[in-house]
Amino acid sequence: MSSSVKTPALEELVPGSEEKPKGRSPLSWGSLFGHRSEKIVFAKSDGGTDENVLTVTITETTVIESDLGVWSSRALLYLTLWFFFSFCTLFLNKYILSLLGGEPSMLGAVQMLSTTVIGCVKTLVPCCLYQHKARLSYPPNFLMTMLFVGLMRFATVVLGLVSLKNVAVSFAETVKSSAPIFTVIMSRMILGEYTGLLVNLSLIPVMGGLALCTATEISFNVLGFSAALSTNIMDCLQNVFSKKLLSGDKYRFSAPELQFYTSAAAVAMLVPARVFFTDVPVIGRSGKSFSYNQDVVLLLLTDGVLFHLQSVTAYALMGKISPVTFSVASTVKHALSIWLSVIVFGNKITSLSAVGTALVTVGVLLYNKARQHQQEALQSLAAATGRAPDDTVEPLLPQDPRQHP
């Protein structure tokens, strides 16, 4: 006899499932990098007519942090390395583009080619961060999907380099830190994701701070500002489609796999594009002549390796902490990049620009905490609804064994 079993009854049989803490206020936002655990949702499954087997399938994949979260030794190591490689890549990009007169498209091509070659080596040689497993089958639209995501990834890199070439590092990083605004818009348009009142209110200081930085920035440039905003839009689109590829039910790609395939697709599209636009002025090109001597080639190769290491450590960190914690860490990285650029490059900023930078940073932090609060509230509501008694469903075991001899 086959029985239909509700989801809450199955959760008690799963080892390691965690109940939400009782007595916690729904408005409590917790610590900045606090531990977050999420329940795995199980679907009911009925056996066949001649079977008494109950099949449990996972219908929703969630990311669960370790008990220490970002404060674990391995996560702290990945966080430190990610910050270090990001800062090195950012400042080396600015040096090559501004002081040496490099082209954003050329530097982006070097970065994509470098991460493709290194990613190919990683798929053949096991390393400490990733053990590649051979894939038996690929989705039918694999090539078109990778070409599309690869195009968005390459456009994100090139547009980011164009913004670095035309505006100060501090201003470019401030504009990039406004990405949550575009995340909300893209999630609503593509995924139909709902955002609550607290999330929408948290965007006000982000937009206000960005307006102050834009109005008072000494090195403001329309091309650089437009490129930075376009980077956010392309990055949000890339993240949405990458999320679908990373969380698919039948064809699920690992993060290093997706990084390699999209980089290879970007390089494949880059070659004909460079040939076709050979005589067309490159976006962001200055009047300086760019000579390729031994030192410049060494700098370009170093930049490509640093770009790949930045991506690898970011993926490794994402595997240890939740996406919300990763987003908060990314916000902290943007804030540190802004002020380190002021120290390293001596960028002049006005008092209003400093206030705008602080407003953007605080607003993005509030946005991430509001998103976390919204997710916890929805999970609490779902758990309360799931625990409600339902007399119409027959229990898995009889409540009184004496009634069923």
UniProtKB/Swiss-Prot annotation:
<dbReference type="GO" id="GO:0001835">
    <property type="term" value="P:blastocyst hatching"/>
</dbReference>
<feature type="transmembrane region" description="Helical">
    <location>
        <begin position="296"/>
        <end position="316"/>
    </location>
</feature>
<feature type="transmembrane region" description="Helical">
    <location>
        <begin position="326"/>
        <end position="346"/>
    </location>
</feature>
<dbReference type="GO" id="GO:0005794">
    <property type="term" value="C:Golgi apparatus"/>
</dbReference>
<keyword id="KW-0472">Membrane</keyword>
<dbReference type="GO" id="GO:0016020">
    <property type="term" value="C:membrane"/>
</dbReference>
<keyword id="KW-1133">Transmembrane helix</keyword>
<feature type="transmembrane region" description="Helical">
    <location>
        <begin position="106"/>
        <end position="126"/>
    </location>
</feature>
<keyword id="KW-0812">Transmembrane</keyword>
<feature type="transmembrane region" description="Helical">
    <location>
        <begin position="264"/>
        <end position="284"/>
    </location>
</feature>
<feature type="region of interest" description="Disordered">
    <location>
        <begin position="1"/>
        <end position="28"/>
    </location>
</feature>
<comment type="function">
    <text>Putative transporter.</text>
</comment>
<feature type="region of interest" description="Disordered">
    <location>
        <begin position="380"/>
        <end position="405"/>
    </location>
</feature>
<dbReference type="InterPro" id="IPR050186">
    <property type="entry name" value="TPT_transporter"/>
</dbReference>
<feature type="transmembrane region" description="Helical">
    <location>
        <begin position="195"/>
        <end position="215"/>
    </location>
</feature>
<dbReference type="InterPro" id="IPR004853">
    <property type="entry name" value="Sugar_P_trans_dom"/>
</dbReference>
<feature type="transmembrane region" description="Helical">
    <location>
        <begin position="142"/>
        <end position="162"/>
    </location>
</feature>
<feature type="transmembrane region" description="Helical">
    <location>
        <begin position="81"/>
        <end position="101"/>
    </location>
</feature>
<feature type="transmembrane region" description="Helical">
    <location>
        <begin position="219"/>
        <end position="241"/>
    </location>
</feature>
<comment type="similarity">
    <text>Belongs to the TPT transporter family. SLC35E subfamily.</text>
</comment>
<feature type="transmembrane region" description="Helical">
    <location>
        <begin position="167"/>
        <end position="187"/>
    </location>
</feature>
<dbReference type="Pfam" id="PF03151">
    <property type="entry name" value="TPT"/>
</dbReference>
<protein>
    <recommendedName>
        <fullName>Solute carrier family 35 member E2B</fullName>
    </recommendedName>
</protein>
<feature type="transmembrane region" description="Helical">
    <location>
        <begin position="347"/>
        <end position="367"/>
    </location>
</feature>
<dbReference type="GO" id="GO:0055085">
    <property type="term" value="P:transmembrane transport"/>
</dbReference>
<dbReference type="GO" id="GO:0015297">
    <property type="term" value="F:antiporter activity"/>
</dbReference>
